[in-house]
Curated annotation (Swiss-Prot):
Organism this protein belongs to: Pseudomonas putida (strain ATCC 47054 / DSM 6125 / CFBP 8728 / NCIMB 11950 / KT2440)
Alphabetized HAMAP family for the sequence: Kup
Membrane topology: Multi-pass membrane protein
Transmembrane segments: 22-42, 64-84, 115-135, 150-170, 182-202, 220-240, 261-281, 293-313, 351-371, 383-403, 408-428, 433-453
Function noted in UniProt: Transport of potassium into the cell. Likely operates as a K(+):H(+) symporter.
UniProt family annotation: Belongs to the HAK/KUP transporter (TC 2.A.72) family.
Gene that encodes the chain: kup
Keyword annotations: Cell inner membrane, Cell membrane, Ion transport, Membrane, Potassium, Potassium transport, Symport, Transmembrane, Transmembrane helix, Transport
Annotated catalysed reactions: K(+)(in) + H(+)(in) = K(+)(out) + H(+)(out)
Subcellular localization, as worded in the UniProt entry: Cell inner membrane
Pfam families: K_trans, K_trans_C
GO MF, any single term: potassium ion transmembrane transporter activity
Name the record gives this protein: Probable potassium transport system protein Kup
Amino acid sequence: MVQASSHAESGHEGKQGASRSVGLLVAAVGVVYGDIGTSPLYTLKEVFTGGYGVSVNHDGVLGILSLILWSLLWVVSFKYVMFILRADNQGEGGTMALTALARRATAAYPRLRTLMVICGLIGASLFYGDSMITPAVSVLSAVEGVGLAFDGIDHWVVPISLVVLVALFLVQRHGTEKIGKLFGPIMVTWFLALGALGVHGISQSPEVLKAFNPAWAVNFFVVHPGIGVAILGAVVLALTGAEALYADMGHFGRKPIARAWFILVLPALVLNYFGQGALLLQNPEAARNPFYLLAPGWALLPLVGLATMATVIASQAVISGAFSLTRQAIQLGYIPRMQIQHTSSDEQGQIYIGAVNWTLMVGVVLLVIGFESSGALAAAYGVAVTGTMLITTVLVSAVMLLLWKWPPLLAVPILVGFLLVDGLFFAANVPKIAQGGAFPVLAGGVLYLLMSTWKRGKQILVERIDEGALPLPLFISSIRIQPPHRVEGTAVFLTARSDAVPHALLHNMLHNQVLHSQVVLLTVVSEDRPRVPEHERFEVEAYGDGFFRVLLHFGFMDEPDVPAALKLCHLDGLDFTPMRTTYFLSRETVIASRLEGMSRWRGNLFAFLLKNANGNLRFFNLPLNRVIELGTQVEI
């Protein structure tokens, strides 16, 4: 009986495990694969109607299909699934997590470390540009199907797209926890529809399956030497969203993402592209919109509805990714602090950042109004995508060689292969900068300027403050000689340096002539890892005479809740009772000058960013009625 019971229990646990695995797989399909899953809407259309000069004939179609297939296999299956997904930072992925790893890998090489940081900032900047382009091009391409269903309403495509997109941004502050549960099933339905349409098309012209032979891709370059590299600028559209596999790894883990790719997403994409190719072999005129023309007439409107839902889900994933990237960048010190609102009581990762949301919305609206069609936007899309892919390869190269210590004989050939393919895709998109691709470059340039100015400005600010800092041991010695009046309670002074006296403490002594019975010099340390366990959260050191030094460590995915963290600090004589604890903050006002370190115009820009950044009070969740803020002026 006991044996039977244990078998029943293990069987039940096995079913639960299988159910959880399927649930994770479906959820991953809904979040991770929305972008790459909607690429069939516009990729082949752009290849054959984008002015590349590719003929819609037997060799041209098979050559392009072979290029798309082997690009998916090399870039997504081999590079991202088999290699990049292994470069996790304690389970987290994405540009900032990878930059943190690369910083750690190059710690012994200062110049190389600086280069890795620059690459990471450029990659993050391009991602924000991509976060504007993806919603615009995806929703436009879906709504364009309405023009095929009803004659004479093409002029409604832009207004309908704008309504859908603006509504999407307006609901962000309320979160997507409830409707988010539908994303997975909807996207699974979408991929099944892609596969079914593809099978329908292939059955009409099975010879299209010859494109599985890579010789057709090689032959295309031989026959079309003039446009061979240029056409990669359109082929790369089939790879848009590949970066999401890595960026969203922290939500689902490597295995569910990999399984979803090989079991459902890759087969559905390949079938659909080949189905569209089969249609083009039969009817070259279908190149104007091969995706929708592949569907039977009765299925067109339902397909437009399903495509619109899929593109909205893809857009939601990119917007959420921008919120997550911003939080990581804030924690790592690359972006000014902003108001972060949690939209779910259960999921810590579901956040809303108003400044990012409204900036993205304005960018998306301007893109839709300015470009008016998905085809016109395709040029801008490729630059952002290929730039991000190339930078990811550069960062992971440092990690593989310097952190993982892979043997160069094994790592270098693989990395050279990645860099060669990424470099070709990027080079193919460089000429598009003059055709609309300037947008992500300009947007990325502006964002890089802001992030680099903030990072450098904060470094100079700390240096200037440190120049006149009083060493803590000297201050404590003077206190012993001339003891000031002490009052009951704990005073917590936030400071970037733990070995010097904070300006706020000196100002408090100067104006109030008193000290609290307990004085805590608190330094918050941002780690290059996503989370710091509670037992590693704090370091405490007693200096005597009621002075303590406390270091709090937070990862870039942690919530920097200082009062909650201080409750974990256990040391005799240290008391953080809320109503007996007062937090003293220093508020710096920056004055741009001609001092070395930063040009005056960048100094003014930094001063503007600092003035509008969220202060320590909200960022560290300090109690409003227990905070005293003291100001100081600093020249940079």
